From Swiss-Prot:
HAMAP family: RutB. The keyword Cytoplasm does not apply. It is an enzyme of class 3 (hydrolase). This is Ureidoacrylate amidohydrolase RutB. Keywords: Hydrolase. The gene is rutB. Hydrolyzes ureidoacrylate to form aminoacrylate and carbamate. The carbamate hydrolyzes spontaneously, thereby releasing one of the nitrogen atoms of the pyrimidine ring as ammonia and one of its carbon atoms as CO2. Belongs to the isochorismatase family. RutB subfamily. GO terms for biological process: nitrogen utilization; uracil catabolic process. Its EC number is 3.5.1.110. The active site is at 38 (proton acceptor), 147, 180 (nucleophile).
Length: 241
């Protein structure tokens, strides 16, 4: 199963089969993108927002390396890579005020209110916290999209950027599995994208069971679940010389 090929000649397409749950899925490389969710200092580096807010980021380092492996395989095969970065303008207008539920629920905003010395430092565009981690820097041909909320499809250019390139299949990696990754994947499903979660290339925020809950939700209701090893194997089968 794969996305709409938009009238393109099937003979010109390059397809591979990805081992996944609940069943394998066929991915046409030209119509598939790896979507990297929020691999920013805020979420994966000591001293970033998530660390300062009291969440355990110990698992993030391993995820960075596995995502780098995924991206190398994807680029070698000619697959599109899209980086998402979560945050707001330096004045936090995009974050919303007290009339927005985001003002009340964002742990970054709550942390800054509790610790005034951090004001203006967390998830502000142009700052260290907002920047992508050193181990995952965009390469020529990669796409970067800003997002102001958990779902990368909300008030962003993501949907139009993907549709303009004929992308119908999305392979998700990043942080946090149970928040921004799942929110974006669910919205992708509702927008008729075929969504795959690479479960060992994601990291959750909170207790271990929330990772398992997201994996269950994706496998049963919203898409397909695979692994870094299986993804890279499928890319090697079609890698450009």
């Amino acid at each position: 199963m794969t996305g709409n090929l938009s009238g393109e000649n099937p003979a010109e397409s390059v397809s591979t089969t990805l081992a996944a749950r609940p069943e394998d899925i066929a991915l046409d490389v030209a119509h598939t993108a790896v979507v990297v969710i929020d691999m920013q200092n805020a979420y994966a580096s000591p001293g970033g927002y998530v660390d300062l807010a009291g969440f355990d980021i110990a698992g993030a380092a391993g995820v960075i390396g596995r995502i780098a492996t995924v991206l190398e395989s994807a680029r070698t095969a000619g697959m599109q890579v899209v980086f998402l970065q979560n945050g707001w303008d330096p004045d936090y207008v995009e974050a919303g005020g007290p009339q927005s539920p985001n003002w009340h629920k964002s742990n970054a905003l709550k942390t800054m209110r509790a610790r005034p010395e951090l004001e203006g430092k967390l998830l502000a565009r142009g700052g260290w916290d907002y920047a992508l981690v050193d181990g995952l820097k965009p390469q020529p041909g990669d796409i970067q999209v800003h997002k102001p909320r958990y779902s990368a499809f909300f008030h962003s250019q993501l949907d139009s950027v993907l549709r303009a390139r004929g992308i119908r299949n999305l392979v998700f990696v990043g942080i946090a599995t149970n928040v921004c990754v799942e929110s974006t994947l669910r919205d992708g499903f509702h927008l008729e994208y075929f969504c795959v979660l690479l479960e060992d290339a994601t990291h959750h925020l909170g207790p271990e069971f929330v990772q398992a809950a997201t994996v269950y939700n994706v496998e049963k209701f919203f898409g397909w679940v695979s692994t870094v090893e299986d993804f890279c194997a499928s890319m090697r089968a079609i890698a450009k010389p």
